[in-house]
Amino acid sequence: MAKVDKVENKDAVVEKKVDKKSKKSSYSKKKKIKKNILNGIAYVQSTFNNTIISIADTNGNVISWASAGQKGFKGSRKSTPYAAQIAADSAASKALEYGMKTLSVEVKGPGSGRETALRALQARGFKILSIKDTTPMPHNGVRPPKKRRV
């Protein structure tokens, strides 16, 4: 006889089965419950080396995310606008499964994938309410690195 305990997780119900004879426990995960979320915030972090797109609900809970490196781009190809477009497309498709319709976009960083990621989100059918640039700008802070000599 196996004893079944239900453990409520934040997103899914996990059943813990304990076998009395062997005293081993195993976990089985049920299907994830998808919530219907209409509004969200897209965070686009574009550095010189990579582009990371996170899509969260209005409370700040991340629903989906993708990066150029996660999509299989390596090295200097991660910093291209095309890689940012593919990453934004992937994050958007996951967010569309939750029924998301409108986005407020926050862009951070000096990278080349900023505008391309925005266009990819808009092409996926999201209505973009606002675009906010949150790139940190120093008020004459630390000394910048010396110029490259190639």
From Swiss-Prot:
One term of GO molecular function: structural constituent of ribosome
GO terms under cellular component: ribonucleoprotein complex; ribosome
Pfam annotation, one family: Ribosomal_S11
Keyword field: Ribonucleoprotein, Ribosomal protein, RNA-binding, rRNA-binding
GO biological process: translation
Similarity-based family: Belongs to the universal ribosomal protein uS11 family.
Record's function text: Located on the platform of the 30S subunit, it bridges several disparate RNA helices of the 16S rRNA. Forms part of the Shine-Dalgarno cleft in the 70S ribosome.
Subunit organization: Part of the 30S ribosomal subunit. Interacts with proteins S7 and S18. Binds to IF-3.
Protein name according to UniProt: Small ribosomal subunit protein uS11
Protein's organism: Pelagibacter ubique (strain HTCC1062)
